[in-house]
Amino acid sequence: FTRRQINIESLNVSASSIKGVHKYTITAWTDKDTIEKVTKQITKKIDVLQAHYFTDDEIYQHEIALYKLTTPTLEEKPEVSKVIRKYNARIVEVNSVFSIVEKNGMSEEITNLYEELSALGCVLQFVRSGRVAITTSCFERVNEYLADRETKYRQSKEQQGQ
């Protein structure tokens, strides 16, 4: 990515629906030609079963963010609570010094909530997960790939046994 001057916006790694197979979600902004080349290079790596790229309209994505706010400001400024409710965020921890607010949703909502809370002067700390995404297609491409490999393996075993 560095060699091609592509900035990774987020990286998420999780287990997939297939035991022993993990899914890497890399979010980056670039043109189609560049991402096609990078995808082909990733596919060539050892232990990579498949690599695909998707545009925003081909995936469902969410993020989670945590906002640490000053509790005194939260108590003194009703606007802070209004902003939290406006974005359907929830307060998950409160003590006398700070409160923690959690927000799940689209990247834009998370950014907008951060900007509004920052403008109110109450943000002590902010972290976000990066995108977690799933394709909107009805099938899992890796499942098809593994099924195809299994079929070819069995066919080669049958031919060897003849």
Predicted regions and their residues:
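Long, contiguous binding/interaction regions
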Residues: 2-22, 32-64, 68-162
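Amphipathic, charged alpha-helical scaffolds that flank and support histidine-based chemistry
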Residues: 25-29
